[in-house]
Amino acid sequence: MKVVSNFIFTILLTLNLSAALEVVTSRIDRGGIQGFHGDVKVHSGATWAILGTTLCSFFGGLEVEKGASLFIKSDNGPVLALNVALSTLVRPVINNGVISLNSKSSTSFSNFDIGGSSFTNNGEIYLASSGLVKSTAYLYAREWTNNGLIVAYQNQKAAGNIAFGTAYQTITNNGQICLRHQDFVPATKIKGTGCVTADEDTWIKLGNTILSVEPTHNFYLKDSKSSLIVHAVSSNQTFTVHGFGNGNKLGLTLPLTGNRDHFRFEYYPDTGILQLRAAALPQYFKIGKGYDSKLFRIVNSRGLKNAVTYDGPVPNNEIPAVCLIPCTNGPSAPESESDLNTPTTSSIETSSYSSAATESSVVSESSSAVDSLTSSSLSSKSESSDVVSSTTNIESSSTAIETTMNSESSTDAGSSSISQSESSSTAITSSSETSSSESMSASSTTASNTSIETDSGIVSQSESSSNALSSTEQSITSSPGQSTIYVNSTVTSTITSCDENKCTEDVVTIFTTVPCSTDCVPTTGDIPMSTSYTQRTVTSTITNCDEVSCSQDVVTYTTNVPHTTVDATTTTTTSTGGDNSTGGNESGSNHGSGAGSNEGSQSGPNNGSGSGSEGGSNNGSGSGSDSGSNNGSGSGSNNGSGSGSNNGSGSGSGSTEGSEGGSGSNEGSNHGSNEGSGSGSGSQTGSGSGSNNGSGSGSQSGSGSGSQSGSESGSNSGSNEGSNPGAGNGSNEGSGQGSGNGSEAGSGQGSGPNNGSGSGHNDGSGSGSNQGSNPGAGSGSGSESGSNAGSHSGSNEGAKTDSIEGFHTESKPGFNTGAHTDATVTGNSVANPVTTSTESDTTISVTVSITSYMTGFDGKPKPFTTVDVIPVPHSMPSNTTDSSSSVPTIDTNENGSSIVTGGKSILFGLIVSMVVLFM
C-alpha cells in the first residue's frame, strides 16, 4: 500500500511540475489566496499583476524575461498583509525584467520568502512593506548572484530584517542593493564589485566572525542616520566605505578601547584608512582621503561607545558608479486592464553590472511614472591614452551626467570615479586627476596634525604620535630622596551587546604603562621617601538585546594614580629591658588567641605544681608557696582575660624580664580569655596539679616549675589553667597571685576548688575582678623564676602564637625566651596616606623585615633568624572589608608606631625556625 501511495504522489508531483504556467500576454488576477504549481515563466513584453492577495505561493521555478514584469500587491485594507512564498529546492529563480512585491498599505506583518536551487537577478526587484511592524524579506539560494538592482524598503523603521543567500555560503553582488529603513545582518561571505547602499536609518551589521567581505565590494552610507557595524572578534579586514560623514557611524560590536601602542581609533591621511580598535582587535575602513582628524568623535551605536562619527561633510565624495544607480520605489502595478497598455517596465541596456558595468556612465532617476535606466558604455580604447568623454542625455526631467575618464587610470575595475558636486541637481562631473590632487592637498593639510585629545578620546593622525605611549615594563625602583613613578592602567571589560532578543559577549583586556620621575625631599635625616598610589575601580553592568535574546556585560576599569610622597619607614623595636613592656604588650595581645587552648591544657599542671615561691612571681609577682596553685588558677584567667599587662608590670624581682613578660601579657590578655574558656584539658590538669602544687609543692614546687608554667600560662593558657589549678589550690593561689595576674580571674579563684573543678571557662573569661582585689598582698620568693617566666610568656608567647595558633612550645631553662622581636616595616607605612580623591583607595607596598633574638647563657641577645617579606601590593575597593584576605596591612598603635597585621604566612618561617632552635 505504501508503495502505491508513493507512486501516486510521484505521478501527481510530475503532473504539477509539468503544468508550467506561460504568461505570454498581459493579465491581471485577483483573489485572496493564489497558488501556482509547476514552473512559471513571464515572457518578454508581458505584464502579470496579482492584486488583492494575502497569500501567493509558487511551487516550482520562476523566470521573468527581459522586458517582462511581475507585480504582486496586497490592497485588501490595512489588516491583511502580503505573504509571498516561492520555495523550490530543485528549480532556479531567474529575473531579467521587473519583479515587484508590495505590502505598503498593510499594518500587519508581511513576509517575502523566495528561494530556489539558484538565484540570479539581472533586472530589478522591489520589496516594499509598511514598516509599522517588523517585516522580513528573504532571497535565498546556495548559488546567489545579483548583477542588477534590488531595492528593499519600508515606509518607516520597525527593525525589518532582510537576508540574502544561504548561511555560511557566498553571495556575489556586482550590482546595486538599496536598503531603506532596514536592518541587514548578512550571514554569508560577500564578494564582487557591487554596492550595498544604506539609506534612511538603515543599520548594517557584518556580524559573523568566520565570514569575509572582499575589499572590492562597496558600502555606501547615503544619509546621516545610517550605520555600518563590524564584528570586533574577527579576522582583520578592510571594508571599502563611501559617504562617511555628516553624522553617520562606523563601529564595532565592542566598545572602542586602545592599548599601550594604539589609540581607540586612528585615521591615516596618507592612505585614507580609518582604524577602529577594541583592545587588540582592529578593523579597517577605507573611507578616503581628506578627513580632518579633529572632527572624529566616539559615539554609541546600539552599544557602549562602540562607534565613530564625523562631524563634517564628506570631504572626498568619489562614489563608484554602481553605488549611484537610483534607489527608486519601482514602477507602479497596473490597476485595470487599460493600464496594461502602458509600458511599465524599465529598460536595462547593459546585461550586467559587473566590472563592465563600472565602465559605464550612470544616469539619474526619471521623475515620470515610467522609470528609465539607460547606460551607454564608454568608448575607451586600451591601446590609446586619449581621454574619451561620454555624455548621456535622458528625456523628461532626468539629470545629465557627464563622466570623464582616462583609459589608463588606475581606479578600481577600470571604472570612472564620479565625484558629486555640492549642488547635486544638474551635473555630476569627475576627474581622477582632480580628485587625486584634492586628496593630496587634504593629506598635506592633515599630516601635520599630531595626537589630539578630544572629549571622547585621543586621535592619532601620524605614525610619530602613535608611538607616544610606547614604553617597556619596568618595576618601581626607589632610592632615598627619589622615586620613579609608573602609571600602570589596566582595563578589563566583559561586554554584552544585545538587540531586542539576542546578546553576544566579548572580553577585552588593555594595559598601558607610562613612566615619569619625581624628586622627593626626606622629612628627616636618612628616612627615605616612597610614592603612594591611589587605585580606582569602576564596574558597570550593561544589558543589550536584539530580536532573539538579551545578555549582560560587565566592564571593569582599574587605574593606578601616583600621589604626593610620604614617610615610608617606621621601625618598632623591643629590647630585653624591663622598660620596654609596651612592645611586649603589643606582641602578646596579637598572638595569644591562637595558642591559649593548647597552652592552657598543658600549662595547668605546671602552674599548679611548679609555681611555688618562685613560680608565684612569674605569673603574678605574688607570694611563693601560696601562689603555687593560684598561679595555675589565677594566672590562667588573669593572663587569659586581661591581666597580661599586670603580669609584666607586677612581677617581683624579675622586673627586667617581667616587663618583657608584659609584652607577653598583652598577648595573654587578648587570647588567654579565649583559650581559657575553651580548653577542656585545663580543668582536668588544673584540678590535679593545682592541689599538688598548693599542698605538696609549696615553695619548692614553685621554684622548680615556676619559670615554665609562668611562660606557658602567663599569656596563653591563663584562662584554662586558671580554672583548673584553682580546683586544688585556688584559694591559696588567689590570695598570692592577685596583684600580678588576678585582675579578672579572682572571682573564680576565690572559691578555690569549686571554681577549679567546674568553672574553668568561667574563671578564664569573666572572674577577674574578685581575684584582682584579693591577691594584691601576696608577693613570694619566686622573683627569679617569675622574671624568667614573665619574659618567656612575654615574647615567646607573642612570637610563637603569632603564626602557629594553638602551637605549644616549652621554654628551656637558662634562655631568656622573652627576648625582643624587631619588626621593621619599609614602604608606605602611613597613618593617613595622601590622596586626591575621596573615592579612591590607597595601594600600600611594604617590605617586612623581622629579626628575632634569644638570650644565651652569657646574658647577651643573639639574633637567630631574619625574614624579609615583600608582599604583593594589594588594594581593596573603598568601604569594603575582606576578612579572609591574607595580604599584610599596616596598623598604627596608640603611641604612633606601626605593626604588621594579617598575612599569616609572613611569620610562618620565623616560627618554624624558633621551634627548631627550642627543640
UniProtKB/Swiss-Prot annotation:
<feature type="compositionally biased region" description="Polar residues">
    <location>
        <begin position="393"/>
        <end position="414"/>
    </location>
</feature>
<comment type="similarity">
    <text>Belongs to the HYR1/IFF family.</text>
</comment>
<feature type="region of interest" description="Disordered">
    <location>
        <begin position="332"/>
        <end position="483"/>
    </location>
</feature>
<keyword id="KW-0732">Signal</keyword>
<dbReference type="GO" id="GO:0009277">
    <property type="term" value="C:fungal-type cell wall"/>
</dbReference>
<feature type="glycosylation site" description="N-linked (GlcNAc...) asparagine">
    <location>
        <position position="619"/>
    </location>
</feature>
<feature type="glycosylation site" description="N-linked (GlcNAc...) asparagine">
    <location>
        <position position="895"/>
    </location>
</feature>
<keyword id="KW-0843">Virulence</keyword>
<dbReference type="GO" id="GO:0005576">
    <property type="term" value="C:extracellular region"/>
</dbReference>
<keyword id="KW-0336">GPI-anchor</keyword>
<feature type="signal peptide">
    <location>
        <begin position="1"/>
        <end position="20"/>
    </location>
</feature>
<feature type="glycosylation site" description="N-linked (GlcNAc...) asparagine">
    <location>
        <position position="580"/>
    </location>
</feature>
<protein>
    <recommendedName>
        <fullName>Hyphally regulated cell wall protein 1</fullName>
    </recommendedName>
</protein>
<keyword id="KW-0325">Glycoprotein</keyword>
<keyword id="KW-0134">Cell wall</keyword>
<dbReference type="GO" id="GO:0044011">
    <property type="term" value="P:single-species biofilm formation on inanimate substrate"/>
</dbReference>
<feature type="glycosylation site" description="N-linked (GlcNAc...) asparagine">
    <location>
        <position position="449"/>
    </location>
</feature>
<keyword id="KW-0472">Membrane</keyword>
<dbReference type="GO" id="GO:0030682">
    <property type="term" value="P:symbiont-mediated perturbation of host defenses"/>
</dbReference>
<feature type="glycosylation site" description="N-linked (GlcNAc...) asparagine">
    <location>
        <position position="236"/>
    </location>
</feature>
<keyword id="KW-0964">Secreted</keyword>
<dbReference type="GO" id="GO:0030446">
    <property type="term" value="C:hyphal cell wall"/>
</dbReference>
<feature type="glycosylation site" description="N-linked (GlcNAc...) asparagine">
    <location>
        <position position="488"/>
    </location>
</feature>
<dbReference type="GO" id="GO:0044407">
    <property type="term" value="P:single-species biofilm formation in or on host organism"/>
</dbReference>
<dbReference type="GO" id="GO:0030985">
    <property type="term" value="F:high molecular weight kininogen binding"/>
</dbReference>
<comment type="function">
    <text>GPI-anchored hyphal cell wall protein required for hyphal growth and virulence. Involved in innate immune cell evasion through conferring resistance to neutrophil killing. Binds kininogen, the proteinaceous kinin precursor, and contributes to trigger the kinin-forming cascade on the cell surface. Production of kinins is often involved in the human host defense against microbial infections.</text>
</comment>
<feature type="compositionally biased region" description="Basic and acidic residues">
    <location>
        <begin position="799"/>
        <end position="811"/>
    </location>
</feature>
<feature type="glycosylation site" description="N-linked (GlcNAc...) asparagine">
    <location>
        <position position="639"/>
    </location>
</feature>
<dbReference type="GO" id="GO:0009986">
    <property type="term" value="C:cell surface"/>
</dbReference>
<feature type="lipid moiety-binding region" description="GPI-anchor amidated asparagine">
    <location>
        <position position="895"/>
    </location>
</feature>
<feature type="compositionally biased region" description="Gly residues">
    <location>
        <begin position="607"/>
        <end position="665"/>
    </location>
</feature>
<feature type="compositionally biased region" description="Polar residues">
    <location>
        <begin position="823"/>
        <end position="833"/>
    </location>
</feature>
<feature type="compositionally biased region" description="Gly residues">
    <location>
        <begin position="725"/>
        <end position="783"/>
    </location>
</feature>
<dbReference type="InterPro" id="IPR021031">
    <property type="entry name" value="Hyphal-reg_cell_wall_N"/>
</dbReference>
<feature type="glycosylation site" description="N-linked (GlcNAc...) asparagine">
    <location>
        <position position="585"/>
    </location>
</feature>
<feature type="glycosylation site" description="N-linked (GlcNAc...) asparagine">
    <location>
        <position position="607"/>
    </location>
</feature>
<feature type="glycosylation site" description="N-linked (GlcNAc...) asparagine">
    <location>
        <position position="631"/>
    </location>
</feature>
<feature type="compositionally biased region" description="Low complexity">
    <location>
        <begin position="344"/>
        <end position="392"/>
    </location>
</feature>
<feature type="glycosylation site" description="N-linked (GlcNAc...) asparagine">
    <location>
        <position position="729"/>
    </location>
</feature>
<dbReference type="Pfam" id="PF11765">
    <property type="entry name" value="Hyphal_reg_CWP"/>
</dbReference>
<feature type="compositionally biased region" description="Low complexity">
    <location>
        <begin position="415"/>
        <end position="475"/>
    </location>
</feature>
<feature type="propeptide" description="Removed in mature form">
    <location>
        <begin position="896"/>
        <end position="919"/>
    </location>
</feature>
